[in-house]
Curated annotation (Swiss-Prot):
Organism of provenance: Enterobacteria phage fd
Role according to the record: Isoform G2P plays an essential role in viral DNA replication. Binds the origin of replication and cleaves the dsDNA replicative form I (RFI) and becomes covalently bound to it via phosphotyrosine bond, generating the dsDNA replicative form II (RFII). In turn, viral DNA replication initiates at the 3'-OH of the cleavage site. After one round of rolling circle synthesis, protein G2P is linked to the newly synthesized ssDNA and joins the ends of the displaced strand to generate a circular single-stranded molecule ready to be packed into a virion.
GO BP field: DNA replication; rolling circle single-stranded viral DNA replication
InterPro entries hit by this protein: G2P, G2P_C, G2P_N
Name this protein carries in UniProt: Replication-associated protein G2P
Amino acid sequence: MIDMLVLRLPFIDSLVCSRLSGNDLIAFVDLSKIATLSGMNLSARTVEYHIDGDLTVSGLSHPFESLPTHYSGIAFKIYEGSKNFYPCVEIKASPAKVLQGHNVFGTTDLALCSEALLLNFANSLPCLYDLLDVNATTISRIDATFSARAPNENIAKQVIDHLRNVSNGQTKSTRSQNWESTVTWNETSRHRTLVAYLKHVELQHQIQQLSSKPSAKMTSYQKEQLKVLSNPDLLEFASGLVRFEARIETRYLKSFGLPLNLFDAIRFASDYNRQGKDLIFDLWSFSFSELFKAFEGDSMNIYDDSAVLDAIQSKHFTITPSGKTSFAKASRYFGFYRRLVNEGYDSVALTMPRNSFWRYVSALVECGIPKSQLMNLSTCNNVVPLVRFINVDFSSQRPDWYNEPVLKIA
């Protein structure tokens, strides 16, 4: 699906001026004039107040703002113009979120995604929209996202952990951008950045953030989004999903042969897809091809202890003063269980204080895990090919209850 679309709409020629900067001719617009014509607010780096009451402002700029839609927001910013940046308005959003309130799955229709951004932008800011040469709109970035499905969240987390050490050729893991449920490659690349992450974890985080807001302070689209995200069927579909996201910049789009003009790109996509292919999926495959080669022949040690974790959590939990359930003690016992799996019963017994060891063993036995089983845990038979879990099936990216979204204007 198209998970992010960044478009740049240049200003009409009559508003664009030029100036010489060294040997470079710089195109720019007068931001104060744009603000007057469109009604937009600007920021000023310097404001001077004179004794006669006059104000002088300098260093005008426009910060990113968010336009509300039915389900989500569209970010936009006015750029004055510089050596490497033609004066324009940049708009960016997740078309999936704008169209349906979530990005667990979504459309690969470039025309529909573009329409969702442009029509909402035109409807919200018609005066600014009229100052732009819409036909000259260019694509600045496309995020193409597809998912592999692990048997459960426990194994999905292990896949992410294994991917942290995978790289190939020019595709390098960016360790400073890696979190518990996310791995990033080529973070600073001007061509494409690759990301793998757990969708169910992200979805739960979004729900938690929205739920923590007082209802009176939530916007109408945030309320709609929370309603969509809380759908049990959606949460079930997201469980076990390992997302592979390609953030594709203009240089990489051009190397694939995609025109950067939006409307030329839409025509290109239409012709391309008529051949029985899918442009967005092939762009995604092109972006990940080097990294996926590293998966061939690779294997990882997989353990599926979700049933064990459930048993421990059902026995060892506490209720906090705020009424929430804490599984801190269960997490410690499960960590001990994992040590038994990886290091062996006898080895762990030799490296822990005797009283602590027996206390942890007793806690696991209380959960219904026989001591004889704890003494014979092994990972020897759990080595499986990595590609078994990195199988991105294009035909199963959406549930059977999916319908192509219909554009709603806020």
